[in-house]
């Protein structure tokens, strides 16, 4: 398997970890020992324990009963033992509070590093799709 194929597979596993809000799956793809960072619209998490508790637990697990993250248009650039992945995504969910459906679209950048021969996520930054209206996006 090439590095690019391994990274594409890792992104698929990342989506599965989100869809199931499963930190056991997530721990197989994140660098759980490093200085990892996850920037998302509801906050910034520093370190694996914060990502596990606040993003997987409080955001994905507590807020939604169903989740489906659909990554698309992956662009992978490998730089030795580091890689950058950029992709668009669509997220379908059911809100736990009232059962209402939620559909959002966005974009994501992931920085990965290869440790022990395996790719791991070191940094994620995701946001909604760009806005182009007057006085938007600043």
PLM regions with names:
Residues 81-91:
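A short hydrophobic beta-strand element
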Residues 103-135:
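Short beta-strand edge/turn micro-motifs at domain boundaries
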